[in-house]
A protein has these predicted regions:
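Divalent-cation
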Residues: 1-97
Length: 97
């Protein structure tokens, strides 16, 4: 038998490619707010990744603050995957023309 389900937790980041700044936390929440963040990401075609340890670390960061150094490797790996997906989508779109 499983215990009560923990409320959802979600964190959204932004990053300006080519800028010398770290990614920033632009949204964070639990429960209904987390569900809304996830729904908006899905509606906007923004990739979502589940990582309980990373979200726990990032959820403690104040809004509009840069991510902590401890999170940089994990976030960089996620961003690399997103950039690769974007390039693949652009190449596929160019092939259809």
């Amino acid at each position: 038998m499983s215990g009560p389900q923990k409320p959802a937790v979600a964190v959204a980041l932004t990053y300006e490619f080519g800028k010398p700044h770290l990614p920033r936390v632009v949204a964070s929440g639990r429960g209904a707010i987390a569900e809304r963040i996830l729904a908006l990401a899905q509606e906007s075609g923004i990739p979502v990744r589940e990582d309980a340890d990373l979200v726990a670390l990032l959820a403690a960061v104040e809004l509009e603050s840069e991510i902590p150094a401890e999170a940089m490797i994990a976030v960089a790996e996620i961003m690399a995957q997103i950039f690769l997906l974007n390039r693949q989508a652009q190449a596929a779109a160019a092939d259809r023309r």
